[in-house]
A protein has these predicted regions:
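C-terminal, beta-rich DNA-binding module of retroviral/retroelements integrases
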Residues: 249-356
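Mobile-element integrase/transposase regions
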Residues: 71, 80-135, 139-142, 153-162, ...
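Basic, flexible linker segments flanking DNA-binding modules
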Residues: 11-114, 119-120, 268-273
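Short, solvent-exposed loop/turn segments at secondary-structure boundaries
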Residues: 125, 146-147, 182-187
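Double-stranded DNA-binding cores of transcription factors and transposases
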Residues: 1-14
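Acidic/histidine-rich, metal-coordinating catalytic segments
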Residues: 164-186, 206-209
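Charged alpha-helix within mobile-element recombinases
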Residues: 192-282, 330
Length: 356
């Protein structure tokens, strides 16, 4: 019995006592369960998600019912159904969270928290894959999440180029002291830092993992949400896992209420735009774009006028012993440029070796 129903009966009983009808008072009937039975399609999906190893959480099941079947319910209803059908997962006790005030940016695009998390994401695979994840600090809009075989420079280039082309460029990224981002020489950039600097994106460094707690909690969200879904759907390859991520990401932004904001990240994003609290910059067309987001190395042209390409040597339109820039793209394409990226000049491609 719900608490509201209890107080309704209690008030009715006190009124009967005041009217001298306490001996004949009876609580009456509630009218029974007014909720319709769930369809076989709904119960089949719940059973599939709760029976997977590891099982999905109740909130994840409710979210998947909405995303896949357009059936709206809450986690409490899923929990009651799971207990009644002996499908409730054995989860550890969680203490009540204490309210904490957290600093956050005012404007959308002022600061994006960015991090990587290695984990055994694919079911039945002992090797760990890496999830690159990025989150707007002001609105909690999860602007990107993608799985890669390992955390490499090319993985970072591929991910950030995708996100910036879709959502625009922020003013700064909040990162850790990983060697991809940080160099001990304050006047020098890493290759990734140089690419971000080329497009006016600053790097701010978190002193501890707790300092970038928003993105760390998002990692925990994906580990609890994505791993059970991949196991339930028997997705064992990165291509299928990223296709599922591409569906889960907008659904979570648009339909799942953030506990700290009291609204969905999409609603917070739209509110920031309406209040003109956005400093995001669109990714303007730039001839240097494919070369900036590539792994660059300096190569000297041989006396024979050739440069190494794999186990072969190719002629190049540059004088012998000249230094050229070798650009390896995330998709495997290889370019040789006469000069390093310079916003005041245009790229001069000397050789292009496409991936086969």
């Amino acid at each position: 019995m719900a608490r509201a129903r209890f107080y309704e009966l209690y008030s009715d009983y006190l009124l009967a006592c005041a009217q001298g009808r306490s001996e004949t008072w009876s609580p009456g009937r509630s009218g029974g369960d007014h909720h319709p039975d769930w369809s076989a399609e709904v119960t089949a999906l719940i059973t599939k998600l709760l029976a997977s190893k590891p099982p999905s959480s109740y909130s994840a099941v409710a979210s998947e019912l909405h995303r896949r079947l357009h059936f709206k319910t809450d986690r409490a209803s899923v929990r009651r159904w799971a207990i009644a059908h002996q499908l409730n997962p054995d989860t550890r006790y969680k203490p009540v969270r204490k309210p904490v005030k957290r600093w956050q940016a005012r404007d959308y695009g002022a600061l994006w928290q960015y991090d990587a998390t290695p984990h055994a994401w694919l079911p039945g695979c002992s090797d760990k894959q890496v999830l690159l994840d990025i989150l707007d600090d002001a609105t909690r809009l999860n602007t990107g999440a993608r799985l890669y075989p390992a955390e490499t420079l090319l993985a970072h280039f591929d991910f950030l180029a995708r996100v910036f082309q879709t959502h625009g460029q922020p003013l700064a990224l909040y990162v850790d002291y990983h060697s991809f981002f940080y160099t001990h020489n304050p006047d020098a950039f890493t290759q990734l830092g140089a690419a971000l600097h080329f497009y006016g994106v600053k790097l701010l460094y978190a002193p501890t993992p707790q300092a970038k707690g928003k993105i760390e909690r998002r990692h925990d969200y994906w580990q609890k949400r994505l791993v059970p879904l991949l196991a339930a759907d028997h997705i064992i390859e990165l291509v299928g896992a990223n296709q599922l991520l591409d569906q889960l990401l907008p659904h979570g932004n648009q339909h799942e209420i953030h506990r700290e904001l009291g609204q969905t990240p999409h609603a917070a994003h739209q509110q920031a735009l309406a209040e003109k609290r956005s400093v995001i910059r669109p990714a303007a067309p730039c001839p240097w774009w494919p070369y900036v987001w590539s792994q660059q190395t300096r190569v000297r042209v041989g006396d024979d006028g050739k440069v190494p390409v794999g186990d072969q040597r190719h002629f190049i339109a540059a004088p012998p012993r000249a230094t050229v820039i070798r650009c390896l793209r995330p998709d495997g394409d290889l370019y040789y440029l006469r000069h390093a990226p310079d916003p005041k000049a245009k790229p001069l491609v000397l050789l292009h070796v496409p991936v086969f």
